[in-house]
């Protein structure tokens, strides 16, 4: 690309260009050693060292991570010693180009590594520093999301504990109901006996009321007869008094009449006494009937209270059945959620193990890369003296470069697919965790505010 085109793209960059001093400060903040000369008068070695450190800090791709794929590719090629350095350089360029694309620099070329320019290096590093600042800002958001995830996991543990407490309460209620079932059955039998006895008493009450009404009528009749007899006795007494006051010629007739009247009076008095005795008996019977009425009202009230208690018992049974059905549904739902949570935890554990293995592999590759760098530095000093001979082979290498680039593209694509699969598995697991937390929120009536 010409210098003029690069100036045009520099003017239309999507990020601000930093000064060399600002770039040095940013590199120092990332613990990347660099001097002002490395920016104003860059060399291929210093530039590649800066880019390598940036790859390791920002993308976790160190020189060691290149060594393994490089050895795998060299295993499929002939003349390994001839292609080793070139292959490593091309793989390093591929990583740098990917970082540049992420930072909004689409025109990153091999010349930026092999023949670096100060202005060009300043532009690329400005874009990368802008990306690093953006990454630091988003790391806070990611930490906040991680904290929210931990809170949700804690809530899930609390909900699981509450579910276990509900199960314990349900078991206690079931055991208490089982213990109280004999008493309930006895009370129900007693209620049935009381009900049958109450029905008998009610029928007896109806008979007593009917008999009471008949006795009242008979008492009223007897009272009327007593009053009538009293009036007759009074009239007879008046007649006797008037008869005694008169003198008659026939004392025998008067005596006979008097004896008849006395006999009639005695019979009437005896009848009156019998009526009074019967009236007293009727009064006693009425008192007994009144007491029976009071007892009957008490039994009726007892029947009403028993019916109310029975209605409450039926309502309690229905509430208990509804609670048991609801608790059973919650238990089934809790078991499903627990199984889903265990599955997510297993997936997270597998991903953690896979990440740990990759971290160990990356660490080992970094150590091998460091040793390889030392070897390459020593070899570079030797090869610097042999550069003239290598220059003759440059044309042959350029002819084979296309084939090598195709093989490298296939290799990079393969590893990109592995990374994409890992990222896809991570986001799938995260979506499943979010779905699980949303399900817990909806089912248990919680409202989570992030």
Curated annotation (Swiss-Prot):
GO-annotated molecular function: microtubule binding; protein-containing complex binding
UniProt superkingdom: Eukaryota
ATP-binding listed as a keyword: no
Coiled-coil ranges (or none): 142-232, 265-414
Keyword entries, A-Z: Cell cycle, Cell division, Centromere, Chromosome, Coiled coil, Kinetochore, Mitosis, Nucleus
InterPro entries: Kinetochore_Nuf2_N, Nuf2_DHR10-like, Nuf2_N_sf
Location of the protein in the cell: Nucleus; Chromosome, Centromere, Kinetochore
Role of this protein: Acts as a component of the essential kinetochore-associated NDC80 complex, which is required for chromosome segregation and spindle checkpoint activity.
Oligomer status and interactors: Component of the NDC80 complex, which consists of at least NDC80, NUF2 and SPC25.
Similarity comment: family membership: Belongs to the NUF2 family.
Protein name per Swiss-Prot or TrEMBL: Probable kinetochore protein NUF2
Name of the gene this protein is made from: NUF2
């Amino acid at each position: 690309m010409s210098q003029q085109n690069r100036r045009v793209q520099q003017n239309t960059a999507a990020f601000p260009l930093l000064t060399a001093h600002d770039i040095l400060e940013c590199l120092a903040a990332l613990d990347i050693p660099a001097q002002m000369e490395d920016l104003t008068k860059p060399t291929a070695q210093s530039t590649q060292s800066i880019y390598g450190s940036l790859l390791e800090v920002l993308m976790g791709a160190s020189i060691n991570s290149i060594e393994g794929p490089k050895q795998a590719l060299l295993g499929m090629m002939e003349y390994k010693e001839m292609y080793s350095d070139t292959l490593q350089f091309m793989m390093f360029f591929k990583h740098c180009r990917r970082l540049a694309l992420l930072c909004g620099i689409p025109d990153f070329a091999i010349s930026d590594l092999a023949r670096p320019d100060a202005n060009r290096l300043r532009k690329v590093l400005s874009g990368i520093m802008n990306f690093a600042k953006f990454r630091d800002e988003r790391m806070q958001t990611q930490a906040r999301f991680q904290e929210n995830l931990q809170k949700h996991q804690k809530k899930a543990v609390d909900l699981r504990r509450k579910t276990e407490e509900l199960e314990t309460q349900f078991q206690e209620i079931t055991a208490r109901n089982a213990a109280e079932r004999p008493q309930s059955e006895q009370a129900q039998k007693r209620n049935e006996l009381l009900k049958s006895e109450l029905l008998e008493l009610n029928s007896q009450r109806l008979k007593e009321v009917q008999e009471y009404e008949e006795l009242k009528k008979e008492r009223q009749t007897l009272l009327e007869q007593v009053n009538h007899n009293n009036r007759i006795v009074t009239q007879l007494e008046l007649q006797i008094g008037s008869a005694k006051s008169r003198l008659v010629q026939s004392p025998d007739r008067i005596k006979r009449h008097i004896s008849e009247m006395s006999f009639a009076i005695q019979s009437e008095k005896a009848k009156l006494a019998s009526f009074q005795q019967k009236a007293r008996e009727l009064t006693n019977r009425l008192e007994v009937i009144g007491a029976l009425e009071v007892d009957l009202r008490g039994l009726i009230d007892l029947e009403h209270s028993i019916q109310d208690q029975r209605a409450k018992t039926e309502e309690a049974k229905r509430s208990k059945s509804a609670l048991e059905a609801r608790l059973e549904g919650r238990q089934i739902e809790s078991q499903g959620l627990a199984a889903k949570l265990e599955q997510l935890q297993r997936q997270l554990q597998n991903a953690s193990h896979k990440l740990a293995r990759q971290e160990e592999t990356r660490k080992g590759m970094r150590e091998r890369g460091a040793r390889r760098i030392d070897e390459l530095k020593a070899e570079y000093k030797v090869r610097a003296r042999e550069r003239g001979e290598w220059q003759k082979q440059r044309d042959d290498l350029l002819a084979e470069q296309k084939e090598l680039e195709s093989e490298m593209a296939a290799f990079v694509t393969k590893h990109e697919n592995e990374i994409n699969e890992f990222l896809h598995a991570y986001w799938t697991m995260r979506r499943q965790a979010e779905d699980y937390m949303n399900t817990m929120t909806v089912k248990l009536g919680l409202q989570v505010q992030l």
